[in-house]
Amino acid sequence: MQLMSRAGFHLSAKNNGGVVTAEFVGCGMPKKNQRKSTTDWSNATTANGLQDIEDTVVAASAEGVTIRYVVMHVADFSLLKKQKSTFDTLKAWVNSSSKILVTKNLINEYLAEQEIPVKIITVNPAVRIEDSAHRRKTINPWERKRVCFLEDLKVGDIQHGPIAAESSATLQKIALMVKQDWILVTKWSEREPFKEWTKAEANAIPVVNDPDAMFIMKVDGKDWNASEDTEGTDDIPATFLGETVEPEDQTIQDTENGE
C-alpha cells in the first residue's frame, strides 16, 4: 500500500524490527509521473478533483499509458464527493434541476462516459507492525492525500529468495524449522532456566511490475518532497534478492466503503 500511495516504502526503527539499509526504497516510478492537484482537495469550495483526475489521465495517455483505475483512500474519496465542483459537474451531467446524491457509483458512471473511461477504487487497509523494541500496533499504510493511477489492478508481486538459516546444519540440530510458502518458522529452547522462542522470517520484498505505467497524485496541492526518490532505487529488488525469485499475487481489492 505504501508502494501505491508513495511509489516507495519507508523503513525505520519505528516501523520495522529488522535490518534497515535504506529509509526510503523507491519502486522505480519516474519523477515525471509524480503529480499534484491544482488545489488542496480538503477545500470543498475551490478544489476540482474530477478535473485533476482527468488531467492526470490525459497526461498519462500522452506517455502511451491508458489509465483504467484510480485508487484512493476512502477518506480522500470523501473529500472528492464533498467538493462543489463535483456536485456541479454531476448535476449538469445528469441534467437535473433538483438535488442529487453524490455517491461512488454516480461518480464512476460519469467517469465511465469520458473519452478515457476510468473507475475509482477505494481502499482502507490496516496492518500490524512491530518496531525494534517489539512493540506492536495497527497502522494504515496508505499515505493520505495520495491518489494512484493504474492500467491494471495486478500491480506487482512479492519476490522472495532463499533464507540463510535454511541450510545451516548447526541450526537444524538445535531447532525445529518449517517453511510455509516463503516464510521460515524456527522454534528453539534453552533448558536452565527453561526458555522457548519462535521466530518467523522471510527474504522478500514487494515489487511493482510496471512502474513506468503508474502515476501518483498528491491531492494537497503541494510539491513532492525531494526525499521521496521514487525512481532512484529501482535496482534494489535485484540486488537484494539475488537471481532466484518467485512471484506472489498482489491484486487490489475494492472496499465497500466510500459510497
Regions found by a protein language model. Give the residues of each.
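Short, glycine/acidic-rich hinge or "gate" loops at secondary-structure transitions
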Residues: 2-21
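Intrinsically disordered, low-complexity, compositionally biased regions/tails
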Residues: 12, 21-22, 30-32, 53, ...
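Surface-exposed loop/turn and secondary-structure junction residues enriched for glycine/proline
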Residues: 12-14, 80, 211
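Extended, solvent-exposed, turn-rich assembly/linker loops in the middle of proteins
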Residues: 20-106, 110
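Sequence/fold signature of self-assembling virion shell proteins
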Residues: 35-44, 87-259
